[in-house]
Amino acid sequence: MTPEHLPTEQYEAQLAEKVVRLQSMMAPFSDLVPEVFRSPVSHYRMRAEFRIWHDGDDLYHIIFDQQTKSRIRVDSFPAASELINQLMTAMIAGVRNNPVLRHKLFQIDYLTTLSNQAVVSLLYHKKLDDEWRQEAEALRDALRAQNLNVHLIGRATKTKIALDQDYIDERLPVAGKEMIYRQVENSFTQPNAAMNIQMLEWALDVTKGSKGDLLELYCGNGNFSLALARNFDRVLATEIAKPSVAAAQYNIAANHIDNVQIIRMAAEEFTQAMNGVREFNRLQGIDLKSYQFETIFVDPPRSGLDSETEKMVQAYPRILYISCNPETLCKNLETLSQTHKVERLALFDQFPYTHHMECGVLLTAK
């Protein structure tokens, strides 16, 4: 695979290999055949970051080869959304012959949505001033004249200039209902929107008919908690990153959801609060004892659940676990399978043409 060529003819074989690999990894815990969710074979990534290489009068996007660390020029990127590809061409054309925008520019980040909105961040090794803002506004207006719905941001050390706004609003069709998700620049969002829809619909399917309340750790911008709210009486979700919490609060209002509460704290802190080890001011006004948590949802970082959180989640009748690293999922299952059994298993091909797998398991108490 090269950045400008995807081996689409190999997609089926690569996906089949992942299914076999996941089944083998899960064999100690389950004999289930994974439910498999395919990715689009191209234009599936909604965000991308490129270094910018200055070559005489020329200027272009590059990435570095992971093995050799050599530079690879990238003029098109079929893994990324069609909007990112349009913007890559338009940004280079707009910046190449503009000394103010070009000088000391070292990276461009792209974030797009299925609703065809974009935020483009230009990263600099220099101070950004009013002259930069004027030139950037002219570029933004020129891009919009090409029917590109784009917002520009300039970044430098301790500086962030958002010309209009630093977010875009995604609209996803999820099980017959449109969900609105605010996505903030430089915050985590799901990279593969088509796969995200399938993950949300699978999570809805495995929790349909649920009783009681849902607890979610690591909720980000509320991606899962808001979609799942329709299956539960109430949802309580935790997140540590301030921009994500603010986006989640916006998303609750935008989707007219009245049974979700987001609190800003780490999963480890919430574990302490639930166990009565510590009291937190951030939990004032929230009566944890009034919740009837029957299901806990976790979507941890690649490192998986720490041992304290492992113990905590074992207290719940049902555990819904989305994993971006099946190796740490299996490590967690060594503990979780002592008290719970695997009821559902899914493979989400979030990252086609790579070794990486995303998977989901529903665990129920034995």
Curated annotation (Swiss-Prot):
InterPro entries documented for this protein: MeTrfase_TrmA_AS, MeTrfase_TrmA_CS, SAM-dependent_MTases_sf, TrmA_MeTrfase, U5_MeTrfase_fam
Tagged with keyword Transferase: yes
UniProt keywords, alphabetically: Methyltransferase, S-adenosyl-L-methionine, Transferase, tRNA processing
Similarity field: Belongs to the class I-like SAM-binding methyltransferase superfamily. RNA M5U methyltransferase family. TrmA subfamily.
Gene3D superfamilies: 2.40.50.1070, Vaccinia Virus protein VP39 (3.40.50.150)
A Pfam short name: tRNA_U5-meth_tr
GO molecular function: rRNA binding; tRNA (uracil(54)-C5)-methyltransferase activity, S-adenosyl methionine-dependent; tRNA binding
Protein name per the record: tRNA/tmRNA (uracil-C(5))-methyltransferase
Active-site residue numbers: 324, 358
UniProt catalytic activity: uridine(54) in tRNA + S-adenosyl-L-methionine = 5-methyluridine(54) in tRNA + S-adenosyl-L-homocysteine + H(+); uridine(341) in tmRNA + S-adenosyl-L-methionine = 5-methyluridine(341) in tmRNA + S-adenosyl-L-homocysteine + H(+)
Lineage of the organism: Bacteria, Pseudomonadati, Pseudomonadota, Gammaproteobacteria, Enterobacterales
NCBIfam families xref list: trmA_only (TIGR02143)
Record-listed E.C. numbers: 2.1.1.-, 2.1.1.35
Stored CDD domains: AdoMet_MTases (cd02440)
Biological role: Dual-specificity methyltransferase that catalyzes the formation of 5-methyluridine at position 54 (m5U54) in all tRNAs, and that of position 341 (m5U341) in tmRNA (transfer-mRNA).
Enzyme class: transferase
Binding site for S-adenosyl-L-methionine: 190, 218, 223, 239, 299
GO cellular component terms listed in the entry, alphabetical order: cytosol
Gene Ontology biological process terms, A to Z: tRNA methylation
Membrane listed as a keyword: no
